[in-house]
Amino acid sequence: MAEQVTLSRTQVCGILREELYQNDAFHQADTHIFIIMGASGDLAKKKIYPTIWWLFRDGLLPKETFIVGYARSQLTVDDIQKQSEPFFKATPEERPKLEEFFTRNSYVVGQYDDPASYKHLNSYINALHQGMQANHLFYLALPPTVYEAVTKNIQETCMSQTGFNRIIVEKPFGRDLQSSNQLSNHISSLFREDQIYRIDHYLDKEMVQNLMVLRFANRIFGPIWNGDNIVCVILTFKEPFGTEGRGGYFDEFGIIRDVMQSHLLQMLCLVAMEKPATTDSDDVRNEKVKVLKCISEVETDNVILGQYVGNPNGEGEAANGYLDDPTVPRGSTTATFAAAVLYVKNERWDGVPFILRCGKALNERKAEVRLQFRDIPGDIFHQKCKRNELVIRMQPNEAVYTTMMTKKPGMFFNPEESELDLTYGNKYKNVKLPGAYERLILDVFCGCQMHFVRTDELREGWRIFTPLLHKIEREKPQPFPYVYGSRGPTEADELMRRVGFQYKGTYKGTHKH
């Protein structure tokens, strides 16, 4: 058994600092101005300010980093602190550090479509670094409706003339291929691709990165990672909660846009892509684009849509269905669950179904990749053997394990299912790594774009799903109902069986969710 390693947060941060400071792309001595556009909003309050605080607390930001909030609301830094501090989870011992953090914060009031406001912002930023070399990082925590005006004004007025400029853009990146192309063309006309960071919070999960190492650093997997040995691949993203009063926003996009076309499609690329020439960002993203180009538009016959209804035995939120959310339009047919089958039409994966499924108000919280291997040829054990599976689970508890057949103790050849545990968490016990948001923000400071979506990736992803989305919006099919807290609609299980997946509900492994 591997020796267990227990590292404190201080030790982990020390290792990360050493890695960062040895990285030429991490300009430790430079002045950095981190500008939060939309600083008065929920995203800034709940995610961005807390993330910047955690990085500052742990000494993972360049020493001369200043944070500037920008929004229309008449606020002060004290107001920002009151709004965001409850999400910082700061301990009493961290109060002095917290006060130091807010001395590096400032707030500028301005309009999003007013050139004069941006001239004022630019003057303020320049005063911070007093004409010295400085790098500007703009986080657009804004609705997409104002992206065009904001990016145009930033490019015309607020760009650093002495350092680098980087723009962080939040999803959704459009609603379909046409709107996405329109937004991409606009942003690409203003900034180079190496300045654009389209953030997908899911892409920097530690286990998502580990998938690449698992595939390409272990010879044992290379010969079997193909359609000759794998019968199907299942990519799952399940949430145990519903819209919880925020259905109005969700109803505009639905589960396909929210999860499937983004998170799950990115996971599919990492499973299916060929080995990149290097681990450089563009080499990895080149291979992901090649995979996407091999996928045809999703066919309606290979899609199941569902919408949760209240659980008659449930309590609180579980007793309510999607349509009981007062913010959801009456009679909405928006899907809260979707299962779709895609095929990668190349030599490695020809004929192998990639089953994508995601949903809200399901029976558990889980995100995983499951590769199910083909049946044993020439079975001598009287069909008692189950299919082998390799499971890479991202949440809730990161795990890597494979299910295998071993002999049951006794006189005769009775196979039974067991696990071969590859989970690195068993070795690195209680090691707390930075979360996805922290890692992604650090990537922006370092100029690493591997975990950000490139323009051509975005275009290919929308190409695959746009015809389906338009058909759904045009015809408004009634989604299959499923009870809050269930596995989802039974029709989805039938679709999975139809394309070759075998459900093994009898096996109870050691990896509880």
Curated annotation (Swiss-Prot):
Keyword Phosphoprotein annotated: yes
Location of Phosphothreonine modifications: T10
One Pfam family from the record: G6PD_N
One GO term (biological process): glucose 6-phosphate metabolic process
Pathway: Carbohydrate degradation; pentose phosphate pathway; D-ribulose 5-phosphate from D-glucose 6-phosphate (oxidative stage): step 1/3
Function: Catalyzes the rate-limiting step of the oxidative pentose-phosphate pathway, which represents a route for the dissimilation of carbohydrates besides glycolysis. The main function of this enzyme is to provide reducing power (NADPH) and pentose phosphates for fatty acid and nucleic acid synthesis.
Protein known as: Glucose-6-phosphate 1-dehydrogenase 2
